[in-house]
Design a protein with these regions (language model features):
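Positively charged
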Residues: 7-199
Length: 199
């Protein structure tokens, strides 16, 4: 399962309840900067903005909506991807067991991680990388992440493993100015670590 599908132009215009925003690409400086923390308590305006991003992700996974607006399906989007260098990101997807992950996270921190690593056998994708770059991206198989979540409106501690852990790490990397393409082995993109778990 990829992190996003379909082709998007350099600056994708995303429609949501009469609001527009563009998705910045890997060529833009904001995606290579370490984002700053959000002041807490979060304002109602910022909370609603992040909730909008969660709703956008839901809509992007509807084929009719995605086709109508010419956008890619996504499971996560971080603030730097829309030109805002702040430590927050939105997540929405269901895992293979039907468990729903719906979060708008502010100032997330990975507080622990496993020695075991994992990777997506299909490779990763990103809304900020218009054309997918092939190769394996190795990440922690299991993480514990703490953040303030605007969906539940409270502090949360998330214990994630497998595909969900990969998705959250992908978005977390955006907050540190790192893209998945930065983590692909340039000499051997499909190098298989025998100790890692293929997902």
């Amino acid at each position: 399962m990829n992190l996003c599908q379909k082709f998007t132009p350099k600056y994708a215009i995303i429609f949501f309840t009469m609001k527009l925003f563009k998705i910045y690409t890997y060529k833009d400086e904001v995606l290579h900067q370490k984002a700053t923390e959000v002041s807490l308590p979060i304002s109602e305006e910022e909370r609603n903005r992040l909730l909008d991003r969660v709703e956008y992700l839901k809509k992007s996974q509807d084929d009719d909506f995605a086709n109508e607006h010419g956008i890619r399906s996504g499971v996560g989007i971080a603030a730097p991807q829309i030109g805002v260098s702040k430590r927050r990101f939105a997540i929405y997807f269901e895992d293979s067991n039907g468990k729903k992950y719906e979060y708008g996270l502010v100032n997330p921190k990975i507080v622990s991680s496993s020695v075991k690593r994992a990777y997506l056998s299909t490779g990763e994708g990103c809304l900020s990388v218009p054309k997918d770059v092939p190769g394996y991206v190795y990440r922690y198989y299991r993480i514990t992440l703490k953040a303030f979540d605007v969906v539940s409106n409270k502090d949360v501690t998330l214990h994630l493993s497998g595909y969900p852990a990969i998705v959250f790490q992908h978005e977390y990397d955006h907050l540190d100015g790192v893209l998945y393409i930065d983590k692909i082995n340039k000499k051997d993109p499909f190098y298989k670590d025998p100790e890692a778990v293929a997902i």
